[in-house]
Amino acid sequence: MALIQTSLIWVAYAVAVAILFLIASTFVYVYQKPRDRAAAVTIVCIFTTLALLATVLLIPVDVALVSSTSRSSLGRKKDWATPDKVDSIVYTLRIVYYTLYSLDAVLCLLVIPFTYFWYEEYDQDAAEHGEQTAAQRIGGALKWTLGFLIFVVAIFLVGFFVPFAKQAKEDKRLDLDYFKHLLSENHGERALSFGLGFLITVGTVLFVLYTGAGMALLPVAMIKSAPSVSAPTLAANTASQLETNRERQRQLEGRNEGREGGLDSRDRRELEALVREERTLIRRERLAAESSGEDRHWIVKAWIKTEAFFRPLKLIGGLILLVFALVIFASMLITGIDKAKNSICGAHCGYILGHINIFQPLNWVLVKSAKVFPIDYVLFLLLVLFLFSASVVGIATAGIRFLWVTIFKIRKGQTSPQALLMATVLLTLITLAINYSVAMVVAPQYATWGPQTYCDMKTNSLDEQPDCAEHKDLIKPCSELATNPAAQQVCTPSVLSTFINRVTINFPFFGIVLFWAQFAFLGVYLIVFLTTLFKAPTLDQEQIDRDLEEEEDEGLLASTGRRFGAAWSDVTGRATKPANYGATERDERIQ
């Protein structure tokens, strides 16, 4: 029975990873620029996105496996859950966590930088003339990657050793053996804890800025946005206008053919205006083709059809996401206040909370649903995907910046390979921060103990399990503050919570920064949310979809189609009756 239950949990995780693969592929194909697509960049971005999402979605598996060793209805261990069996489950989870975290670090710090520099090293002219070989390109990429890696390792070593250097100097132990001992302590777990804490802290800064803004923008943008004219109708109207424009140009040129001095001033001005309009219409024609998925990957076409089909439900979906975002905001605020007020050790250990003192809605829902796996897994998947989508929206809105300078812009169908790689790095770091935030702030009881309970009765011996079958009122949720020895025998904390607590206890600075950054996240969310309520959202997703050129005239891309008509045209791929918008009365008379 235990093997079947454990196997089902891992099967559910495998199914979730398969779903994540589709989501990661869709994300990459929707945002990348088709004309600049590179197979290596696409594969690296998809695999990295899959790995980082799989890391976060290991939390419900962790909770389900450690919780499967006990009966929450009786507050006691199951008969098969011997200490050796429990240790085996925890050891397996620890290996999976180490593997995924190491994979995320290698992808973020080694593979993506190499791919970025490899793409940057490409010189089309030199390659066409045989002056640049694959070996030269790889050598240049390796050189830059090695330099970047040395820089990162230097920061890591300085950050790791400096806090201990002062104490070692006072104790007169400032030698090489002492620092070797620090690195190898607990088989290197202390060094790994520092590395994980460092990456989470960097990711938290991005989490505050991008995810905080994106969580406010995403629902409001969905509510306020209206679908533009459908892509098929836009293409049909543009073709009609383009034909009229060119016919008028031919008439002007034919009327003045052979005329001494060429066109008169009035006709010349009109012809120049027609030429400018023709260029704009050609851009719009190409834009309509790309928006409808022409010559795009089948994943992009499927995404466009799905988006168009559900477009009329955007308002309802936006309202649901708005409520969900507010619940997350309230849950994080409640936990933050609870930790600041009732933490068992305060800043010395990163504000670890012994047990929930204030009712927290999201944590309560996840704990209750965890009793029937995989309901909690589905809810947790939706939570993670919402925060991930909010991060994408935040990055798409602000772009990739250094201070006030925009380095890259992230747009659907218009993102360069370099920008896509940089965005993937940011999302990797943000996802590590989401890992901390979900486990320690959004749902701390769920992520630490799940639905585990213990029987708070005294027993005659330490090896005997108390029986609360007749005393249900003595069954209590597992807590770090439990004093009954039975709690230590029954309650098994999740592996992730152990990792994070080790980081915040060994390196209190990380714990302080990570905890107070959650309030900064709430502040950014509140500011952006209130701003978008009284002002048009800065992110217009439909406009971004159609913004092919920076100099595109805004008037030519106005939303003129009907809401449901545009959606149905995009689904069927057929245009409604073309409208002669943009044509002048004079053009109509000439026709």
Curated annotation (Swiss-Prot):
<dbReference type="InterPro" id="IPR006876">
    <property type="entry name" value="LMBR1-like_membr_prot"/>
</dbReference>
<feature type="transmembrane region" description="Helical">
    <location>
        <begin position="198"/>
        <end position="218"/>
    </location>
</feature>
<feature type="compositionally biased region" description="Basic and acidic residues">
    <location>
        <begin position="244"/>
        <end position="266"/>
    </location>
</feature>
<feature type="transmembrane region" description="Helical">
    <location>
        <begin position="95"/>
        <end position="115"/>
    </location>
</feature>
<feature type="region of interest" description="Disordered">
    <location>
        <begin position="238"/>
        <end position="266"/>
    </location>
</feature>
<keyword id="KW-0846">Cobalamin</keyword>
<keyword id="KW-0812">Transmembrane</keyword>
<keyword id="KW-1133">Transmembrane helix</keyword>
<feature type="transmembrane region" description="Helical">
    <location>
        <begin position="39"/>
        <end position="59"/>
    </location>
</feature>
<keyword id="KW-0458">Lysosome</keyword>
<comment type="similarity">
    <text>Belongs to the LIMR family. LMBRD1 subfamily.</text>
</comment>
<feature type="transmembrane region" description="Helical">
    <location>
        <begin position="315"/>
        <end position="335"/>
    </location>
</feature>
<dbReference type="GO" id="GO:0072665">
    <property type="term" value="P:protein localization to vacuole"/>
</dbReference>
<dbReference type="GO" id="GO:0005774">
    <property type="term" value="C:vacuolar membrane"/>
</dbReference>
<feature type="transmembrane region" description="Helical">
    <location>
        <begin position="422"/>
        <end position="442"/>
    </location>
</feature>
<feature type="transmembrane region" description="Helical">
    <location>
        <begin position="509"/>
        <end position="529"/>
    </location>
</feature>
<feature type="transmembrane region" description="Helical">
    <location>
        <begin position="378"/>
        <end position="398"/>
    </location>
</feature>
<feature type="transmembrane region" description="Helical">
    <location>
        <begin position="144"/>
        <end position="164"/>
    </location>
</feature>
<feature type="transmembrane region" description="Helical">
    <location>
        <begin position="8"/>
        <end position="28"/>
    </location>
</feature>
<dbReference type="InterPro" id="IPR050854">
    <property type="entry name" value="LMBD1_LysCbl_Transport"/>
</dbReference>
<dbReference type="GO" id="GO:0031419">
    <property type="term" value="F:cobalamin binding"/>
</dbReference>
<keyword id="KW-0813">Transport</keyword>
<comment type="function">
    <text>Probable lysosomal cobalamin transporter. Required to export cobalamin from lysosomes allowing its conversion to cofactors.</text>
</comment>
<protein>
    <recommendedName>
        <fullName>Probable lysosomal cobalamin transporter</fullName>
    </recommendedName>
</protein>
<keyword id="KW-0170">Cobalt</keyword>
<dbReference type="Pfam" id="PF04791">
    <property type="entry name" value="LMBR1"/>
</dbReference>
<keyword id="KW-0472">Membrane</keyword>
